[in-house]
């Protein structure tokens, strides 16, 4: 098989993973999502956002203390040319600004950077952010293993720990 045209990836143990690569290929066929990246003040979160930009899947709006962000980028060799940067005083401020941008519809998605989850969740759930609905907040993530042929989409492993039946109904509605 020609590796340059394959959508498969070999893992260290020789297994093949395909699901996430197929998902990424599908997403690349769509218009990029305008995504606020909240406080990407470490090389990992900033690099992930820039990788997604290079893949053509997002248009990042970086919200962080600008001086700190530029220092992280310089240290990691990351080029911020063409990125929209919104200066924020600190991580809490970045979360509040990002939530307001999402609430106003100026971005389509949020990506957590190097701030604590509770900081971001507090800003998202603040009444003035405009993001609350009548249903519970839920989340999901994609996980792939070598021993199963498709990726798993796992919801509420951390936010709704022991949901009631009514809360489970909201989780399912949100997932659909």
Model-inferred region functions:
Residues 2-61, 65-176:
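Anion-binding alpha/beta catalytic cores of soluble intermediary-metabolism enzymes, centered on
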